């Protein structure tokens, strides 16, 4: 499956929030201090990186999108270092300088890839006049496709509700990385992106995925949100939207060195993808891939388009087109965005023969993409008897995915794929045999969506049952 990155260069995003400077001191440690039972680090490298809302803007700019950053800083060396670092990566800064406060700075001391201590230099910006921030937002709304509010509870978003209303009035989606348990502050936002700990701090401990969905949907209703994305660490992400099935995406992280700034990467990629004109589901797909990359780096980091493309391609190509239901929905959404016609068929495909191959090739000719939905082993056993399937599901799917005619392969557990088809809603639903169109599972849903249903003939003389009988006869003979 070929995956096309969003057109990030046409995306304009404004980030407003708590800006900070992350400082890193690196060095070896080989002894314990005689003054106290602590390691002595001989510092040999010092780095400075934008953090907080500034890291979100960096992530947006690293994708090639147009990033604008608004926040509160002091008038000091840290503010100047921030401005220079951000200008170097094409982030347009429009800071509000507050003479009475220092720029928020976090110093981390590391040795042997381990963080030993963090020192914070800050005074909250609560009580600072928010009007200059509002003015900057108003000036930018006509030229951006998304507004990110990055909340680290340092005071820049004290008037967050007014900021939400300004953006919603202009029709600009508002994405918020929340802080604390008072989600009333974020009422009316387009999307909240809490991690699981932040989510459970508001709704209570969730023992199952079903509880996450149930309580998340209540949260959406209570605070008039358009959507909620719960990031769940090694369990991936869950996107919840009113009137839609939950979208659960498994994690793509191979190795985890440091989760610092991972939430910034997620919301940055989400915003840039939405501002480029892609759907929220597609935005989550790319954000999930980006998160898998960034947690494999040390410290606050960004993801380049090449890294993102490689991560996405690696996931999309796994198993020769074999996909989860959630991944398939994203792939179909992307295909539709490109104007491609999606064809779908289903079956057991136990022992693949010439009749199957011919049928699938003919089905593929009717559109641009072909989905093959395959009965699980349990489903096959219920339909065909205890002796079937001959080949387990994984092998059947890999063989189907290797066919040139087949783009995507997905499995289903039920006796029929009606639920799956209703979730995918292909442009054309195809079935082989002597069915009448109205007898085909999922036909009513496809027709109701404006799609077509077609019956194709199988090649005469080819059937899995006949092949099995012949094998059994040959063994007896």
Swiss-Prot record:
Question: Do you know which InterPro entries this protein is assigned to?
Answer: Bifunc_HldE, Carboh/pur_kinase_PfkB_CS, Cyt_trans-like, PfkB_dom, RfaE_dom_I, RfaE_dom_II, Ribokinase-like, Rossmann-like_a/b/a_fold
Catalytic residues per the record?
264
Q: What is catalysed by this protein?
A: D-glycero-beta-D-manno-heptose 7-phosphate + ATP = D-glycero-beta-D-manno-heptose 1,7-bisphosphate + ADP + H(+); D-glycero-beta-D-manno-heptose 1-phosphate + ATP + H(+) = ADP-D-glycero-beta-D-manno-heptose + diphosphate
Cellular component terms (Gene Ontology)? cytosol
Q: Where does ATP bind?
A: 195-198
Q: Could you tell me which residues carry N6-acetyllysine? A: 179
**Chain residue ranges for the region called Ribokinase:** 1-318
Q: Which GO terms describe its molecular function?
A: ATP binding; heptose 7-phosphate kinase activity; heptose-1-phosphate adenylyltransferase activity; phosphotransferase activity, alcohol group as acceptor
Listed GO biological process terms: ADP-L-glycero-beta-D-manno-heptose biosynthetic process
Gene3D superfamilies the UniProt entry points to? 3.40.1190.20, HUPs
Q: In which pathway does it act?
A: Nucleotide-sugar biosynthesis; ADP-L-glycero-beta-D-manno-heptose biosynthesis; ADP-L-glycero-beta-D-manno-heptose from D-glycero-beta-D-manno-heptose 7-phosphate: step 1/4; Nucleotide-sugar biosynthesis; ADP-L-glycero-beta-D-manno-heptose biosynthesis; ADP-L-glycero-beta-D-manno-heptose from D-glycero-beta-D-manno-heptose 7-phosphate: step 3/4
Q: Which UniProt keywords apply?
A: Acetylation, ATP-binding, Carbohydrate metabolism, Kinase, Multifunctional enzyme, Nucleotide-binding, Nucleotidyltransferase, Transferase
EC numbers, comma separated? 2.7.1.167, 2.7.7.70
User: Where is the segment annotated Cytidylyltransferase?
Assistant: 344-477
Q: How does it assemble?
A: Homodimer.
The record's annotation in PANTHER family points to:
BIFUNCTIONAL PROTEIN HLDE
Q: Which NCBIfam families does its entry note?
A: cyt_tran_rel, PRK11316.1, rfaE_dom_I, rfaE_dom_II
- Physiological role: Catalyzes the ADP transfer from ATP to D-glycero-beta-D-manno-heptose 1-phosphate, yielding ADP-D-glycero-beta-D-manno-heptose.
Report the sequence similarity comment from the record.
In the N-terminal section; belongs to the carbohydrate kinase PfkB family.
* Protein's name according to its UniProt entry: Bifunctional protein HldE
């Amino acid at each position: 499956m070929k995956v096309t990155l969003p057109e990030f260069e046409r995306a304009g995003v404004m980030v407003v929030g708590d800006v900070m400077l992350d400082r890193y001191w690196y060095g070896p440690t080989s002894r314990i201090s005689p003054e106290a039972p602590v390691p002595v680090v001989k510092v040999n490298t010092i780095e400075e990186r934008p953090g907080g809302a500034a890291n979100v803007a960096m992530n947006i700019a690293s994708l090639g999108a147009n990033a604008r950053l608004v926040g509160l800083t002091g008038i000091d060396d840290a503010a100047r270092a921030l401005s220079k670092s951000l200008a170097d990566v094409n982030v347009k800064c429009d800071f509000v300088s507050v003479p009475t406060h220092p720029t928020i700075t976090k110093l981390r001391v590391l040795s042997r890839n381990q963080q030993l201590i963090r020192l914070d230099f800050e005074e909250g910006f609560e009580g600072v006049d928010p009007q200059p921030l509002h003015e900057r937002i108003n000036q930018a709304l006509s030229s951006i496709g998304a507004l990110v509010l990055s909340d680290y509870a340092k005071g820049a978003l004290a008037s967050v509700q007014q900021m939400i209303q300004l953006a919603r009035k202009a029709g600009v989606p508002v994405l918020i990385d929340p802080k604390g348990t008072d989600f009333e502050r974020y009422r009316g936002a387009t999307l909240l992106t809490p991690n699981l700990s932040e989510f459970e701090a508001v709704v209570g401990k969730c023992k199952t995925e079903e509880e996450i969905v149930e309580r998340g949907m209540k949260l959406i209703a209570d605070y008039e949100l358009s959507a909620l994305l719960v990031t769940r660490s090694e369990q991936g992400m869950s996107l919840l939207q009113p009137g839609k099935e939950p979208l659960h995406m498994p994690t793509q992280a191979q190795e985890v060195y440091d989760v610092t700034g991972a939430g910034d990467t997620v919301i940055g990629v989400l915003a840039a993808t939405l501002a480029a004109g892609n759907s929220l589901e597609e935005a989550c797909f790319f954000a999930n891939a980006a998160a898998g990359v960034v947690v494999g780096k040390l410290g606050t980091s960004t993801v380049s388009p090449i890294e993102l493309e490689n991560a996405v391609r690696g996931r999309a190509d796994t198993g020769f087109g074999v996909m989860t239901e959630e991944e398939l929905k994203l792939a179909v959404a992307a295909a539709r965005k490109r104007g491609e016609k999606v064809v779908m068929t289903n079956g057991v495909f136990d022992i693949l023969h010439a009749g199957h191959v011919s049928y699938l090739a003919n089905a593929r000719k009717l559109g641009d993409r072909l989905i093959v939905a395959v009965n699980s082993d349990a489903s096959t056993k219920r339909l065909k008897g205890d002796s079937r399937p001959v080949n387990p599901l994984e092998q059947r799917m890999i063989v189907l995915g290797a066919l040139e005619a087949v783009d995507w392969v997905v499995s289903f557990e039920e006796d029929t794929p009606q639920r799956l088809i209703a979730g995918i809603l292909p442009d054309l639903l195809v079935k082989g045999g002597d069915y009448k169109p109205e007898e085909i599972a999922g036909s009513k849903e496809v027709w109701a969506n404006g799609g077509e249903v077609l019956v194709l003939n199988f090649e005469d003389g080819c059937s899995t049952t006949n092949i099995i009988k012949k094998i059994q006869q040959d063994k007896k003979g």
